[in-house]
Structures are given as structure tokens and as C-alpha cells.
């Protein structure tokens, strides 16, 4: 059995530091790098690409809404054509840095509000999938299972990678609990590790609003903006490896 461990990175902007890139890169197997719209100034993106290269971490594009002030966590009413163009633009921007450093683009995973909107809005999901397909039909797209986002990615003929979140709470409907909801963040590293094991080995996890929810996980996400993200990533990886799960990029 194997699973990927991913984290968001490269989200600092100029003098404004964000996340724990240097601490978390040695612990994960893939990283989703900001592309300049929600975070990531050119110098910071290049820095993150070089860190990934040094640690053998697979690099994916992490396109978001054009919202630096809100860090891409505020939903925007963009047309499908605007979403398509924005995603294509951001993939291209990151690809320039990867080409300069001799690295391939490994996957695409939307950020924040764009990811969540794609999970429930079919037109947004389709626009993302078509942008990825237009850039490279062989690029994997990371999705939340059981959503219209997964459906549209499959319709586009893309390789779909199913994602789960050990440090985010789920609702019974399979969606992530809103960040504003008490208990939506799992901050204890050992609890996150326990949840990760259940997700990978049992295919389920407890829901915040009661009962359990089925989970399919080919990659597990650790949010880089979690205050103790390195500790969570370390605990999750150690627990998986001790259970005999191979942790490597998909």
C-alpha cells in the first residue's frame, strides 16, 4: 500500500513570509506551489522550486483566485472563461520556473476557494479541467472524491488523484467542514496521524457532525499555513511508515 503526502508551499510574497516551507519540504513527497495569484511572488516561487529540487519533492501547480488580500480564500464570481484563462496562466507561470530548474510539472491542485467552488459548481470544475487538459492532457488533477469536480476531471479524460485531509474535519456529506466551524481544524499531531491511518487503511474517518464518512485517499494534504504543520506532517508520515504504508509521490 502506498500514499502521497502533499503540502501547499511557495505562498510567501516578497517580504511577507507565509507557511513553513523549509521545515516541511523534508517531510512531504509532493508540494503544491502558489503561482502568484493568491500568494507567491516570483522570487518566493523560485525559492520554493529550488527547495523542492533539493529534497526530491514532486512539484504541482496550485492556482487560485486572483485575491492576494484574501489569500485566495474568498469566493469570486468569475465566468468559466475567466477561470479557464486564470488557471492556464498560473500553470504556465510556474512551469517557467520548473523549466529553468530542470524539473517537470507533476500535477495541478487548485487552491482554497477555487478548489471548494469546483467541488460544488460544475462550470468552475469543467473550466479547471479543460485548462489543465489544454496545457497537458497527461497532467494529473488532484480532486476531492465524490464531487462534481471529480466528475468533470474524469469527463475531460484527465488522470484523477483522490485527496483526503487528515488535519481538516469532514461533515457527513463528505465535504470539508467550513473553517469557521468549531473543531474544523485538527491541531494535535497525534490525532491527525490517527486520522490519516484510518483514511488510508480503513477508507473512512469520523465526521464532525456525527457518524463516519467514507474517504478515498491517494494523497494526503497537510496545510502549510497550519501553525504546527511540520509537526503534523512528521507525525502523519511516521505513523504511516510504521504501519507499513509506503509514502511516495503518486
UniProtKB/Swiss-Prot annotation:
Pfam families (alphabetical): LamB_YcsF
Keyword Hydrolase: yes
Keyword annotations: ATP-binding, Hydrolase, Nucleotide-binding, Plasmid
Signal peptide segment: none
EC number: 3.5.2.9
SUPFAM superfamilies reported in the protein's UniProt record: Glycoside hydrolase/deacetylase (SSF88713)
MF annotations from Gene Ontology: 5-oxoprolinase (ATP-hydrolyzing) activity; ATP binding
Catalysed transformations (reactions): 5-oxo-L-proline + ATP + 2 H2O = L-glutamate + ADP + phosphate + H(+)
InterPro entries named in the record: Glyco_hydro/deAcase_b/a-brl (IPR011330), LamB/YcsF/PxpA-like (IPR005501)
Any single GO BP term: carbohydrate metabolic process
Function: Catalyzes the cleavage of 5-oxoproline to form L-glutamate coupled to the hydrolysis of ATP to ADP and inorganic phosphate.
Assembly description: Forms a complex composed of PxpA, PxpB and PxpC.
Family note: Belongs to the LamB/PxpA family.
The name this protein goes by in its record: 5-oxoprolinase subunit A
Designated gene of the protein: pxpA
Amino acid at each position: 500500500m502506498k500514499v502521497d503526502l502533499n503540502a501547499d508551499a511557495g505562498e510567501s510574497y516578497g517580504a511577507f513570509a507565509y507557511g513553513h516551507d523549509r521545515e516541511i519540504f523534508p517531510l512531504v513527497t509532493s508540494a503544491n506551489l502558489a503561482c502568484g495569484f493568491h500568494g507567491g511572488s516570483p522570487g518566493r516561487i523560485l525559492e520554493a522550486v529550488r527547495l523542492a529540487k533539493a529534497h526530491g519533492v514532486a512539484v504541482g501547480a496550485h492556482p487560485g483566485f486572483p485575491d492576494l488580500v484574501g489569500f485566495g480564500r474568498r469566493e469570486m464570481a468569475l465566468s468559466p472563461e475567466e477561470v479557464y484563462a486564470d488557471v492556464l496562466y498560473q500553470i504556465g507561470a510556474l512551469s517557467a520556473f520548473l523549466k529553468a530548474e530542470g524539473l517537470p510539472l507533476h500535477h495541478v491542485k487548485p487552491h482554497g476557494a477555487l478548489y471548494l467552488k469546483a467541488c460544488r459548481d460544475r462550470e468552475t470544475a469543467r473550466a479547471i479541467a479543460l485548462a489543465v487538459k489544454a496545457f497537458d492532457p497527461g497532467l494529473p488533477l488532484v480532486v476531492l472524491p465524490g464531487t462534481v469536480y471529480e466528475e468533470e476531471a474524469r469527463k475531460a479524460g484527465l488522470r484523477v488523484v483522490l485527496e483526503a485531509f487528515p488535519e481538516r474535519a469532514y461533515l457527513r456529506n463528505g465535504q470539508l467542514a467550513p473553517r469557521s466551524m468549531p473543531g474544523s481544524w485538527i491541531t494535535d499531531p497525534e490525532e491527525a496521524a490517527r486520522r490519516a491511518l484510518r483514511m488510508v487503511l480503513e477508507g473512512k474517518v469520523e465526521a464532525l457532525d456525527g457518524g463516519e464518512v467514507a474517504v478515498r485517499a491517494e494523497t494526503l494534504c497537510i496545510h502549510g499555513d497550519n501553525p504546527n504543520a511540520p509537526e503534523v506532517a512528521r507525525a502523519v508520515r511516521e505513523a504511516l511508515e510504521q504501519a507499513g504504508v509506503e509514502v511516495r509521490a503518486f
